[in-house]
Structures are given as C-alpha cells and as structure tokens.
UniProtKB/Swiss-Prot annotation:
First-tier enzyme category under EC: transferase
Reactions accelerated catalytically: N(6)-carboxybiotinyl-L-lysyl-[protein] + acetyl-CoA = N(6)-biotinyl-L-lysyl-[protein] + malonyl-CoA
UniProt function note: Component of the acetyl coenzyme A carboxylase (ACC) complex. First, biotin carboxylase catalyzes the carboxylation of biotin on its carrier protein (BCCP) and then the CO(2) group is transferred by the carboxyltransferase to acetyl-CoA to form malonyl-CoA.
The enzyme's E.C. designation: 2.1.3.15
Stated name of the protein: Acetyl-coenzyme A carboxylase carboxyl transferase subunit alpha
Single GO MF descriptor: carboxyl- or carbamoyltransferase activity
Organism superkingdom: Bacteria
Domain CoA carboxyltransferase C-terminal per the UniProt entry, residue ranges: 39-293
GO cellular component: acetyl-CoA carboxylase complex
A Gene Ontology BP annotation from the UniProt entry: malonyl-CoA biosynthetic process
Amino acid sequence: MNPNYLDFEQPIADLEAKIEELRMVGNDTDINITDEISRLKKKSISLTESIFSDLKSWDIARLARHPRRPYTQDYIDLIFEDFDELHGDRRYADDLSIIGGTARLDNTPVMIIGHQKGREVRDKVKRNFGMPRPEGYRKALRLMEMAERFKMPILTFIDTPGAYPGIGAEERGQSEAIAFNLAVMSRLKTPIISTVIGEGGSGGALAIGVCDQLNMLQYSTYAVISPEGCASILWKSAEYAAQAAEAMGVTADRLKELGVADHVIDEPLGGAHRNPEKMAETLKTSLAQGVAELSRLPLDELVSRRYERLTRYDGGR
C-alpha cells in the first residue's frame, strides 16, 4: 500500500495508481489516452469526496497524524515573511520540539510559536517527535512575554501527541512549566490566536493553547488523552481506539459544538497534505482576519474575555 494513503483511502490509492500507469503508457507510446486519464481523474475526485464525506472520528485522528501533513515550519514558510527564529529558555537548553520567533503576517509584526515534529528519523529524534520538555514550554513563555512587551499578537500552532513524559523532564518541572504557562497566558495583554494543525494532545497542547480565538483545521483533533490511551484505560486494550475516539469527541466539528473551538477551517479535498499551499492560503486569511478583529479590542476587555473563555471549559465552576 502507498504509505501516503491510509487504509480507508485504499480505493483512492488504487485509482491513482491506475492513472499513473496510464501516464507511463502514454509517455512510452504514441497512443492518446488523455480522455481516459481525464475520466479517471474525475472519478478519483468523486470517490475522494464520497469517502471523506463520511469519515469516522478514528479516521480523522489518523489523518491528524499523517506523516506528510504540514507542520509549523511549513506554515511559517508558506504564510509569513521575515521569520527570525529565537532560541532557548535562558535557563537550561533549547528544545527543538518548540519553534518560535518574530515574523510578519502581511505587514503586521507577530510572534509565532508552535510544536514541530520531524519528517525523517534523524529529524524526528532531534524534534523529540513533537513532544516538548519543560525548557520548550519555558522558551515559549519567554517569547510570549516578549510579544506582550513589544505589543505583538501571538500566533500558536498546536501539533503534539503530548508533553514529553521522560524522567528528566519530570525532574526539571514538566507539570510546573505547563501550569505556569497556563497562568501567564491567561493574563497576557496582547491578542493570542491558537490553531490546532494536527493532533492536540492534553496539557502538552494546552500549554501554548490558552487564547482569545481557537481555530481547528478540519481534520485535526484536540483531547485530554489519545484514543489509544483512553482505550487502554477504559477497555484495557488499545484495539478499542476507534470506539474511544468516537466517545471522546476529539474532532473539530464536535469541539466547535461544545464551544471549545471557535472556527473550523476547511482543508483541501483529501486533507492538508494533499495541497499544503492551498491550506496555507486559507489559514492565512483566517489568521489575518482574527488578528484584525482582536487588535481592535481594548486590552482589559481582551484579557477579561479570555478568562471567561477559560471558565466555560468547566461549565463556569
């Protein structure tokens, strides 16, 4: 099976393989098969629309983790100008699973902070598979406080299976780093927009996700635990991950219904990885609109609304 396709996409993969075979035949002979290729392309689009119109929560959870899905660095390259990466937490180290720095969204200076996974094995290890350690969250906090000082909107990109659970991370205060971020972000006097671009895993995601506006890409997820983790606890087996994903309500549409997400941003047909440029263009429009709207609010009102938003997560208790 083509690794760029998930199992529920197998009929699409088979059809695309047939189209590619016909292209090769056309290149090697004088036979004109343009009409047949065009017919199969239309059939592929129709089939993709049919499959993606009825995705289950578990299908979406796997799409959110797709290895070709655009990461934070990809969106930085496609959306922003003059990105200047900033490093280190000024206490311990530079955690490369969190990237951040100043940039321009059109002509507006912004601070960008996001989780970063790796593509190849060596890069995955360097980025710690997108699982930040305490120094990553402290780096993020340093950049957020800098953004407040220079009156720059903060744009965060969430894409992590969760905070790193290693012994060293715990010894250096993983839970304290996350909790401190939540407290400080709740009162920062600058607009904050967070976008879940892949998987939003537990406190590791929330540590850069306290915001004035939460966007979720159409095939992203946000949850307190992975479906496999939930299934292992409740059903004693990760084999029940599909049932867990459905019960947890991890998808963008479900979270918008609950009032957790503000906007669900449509992805290109087949997911963001099928057309990263189009996805970036759509996301850029949403971010620019959000920054413009939030920047018009008085800062005290902005912070007050953010706090009210947080209290709604637990029913206002």
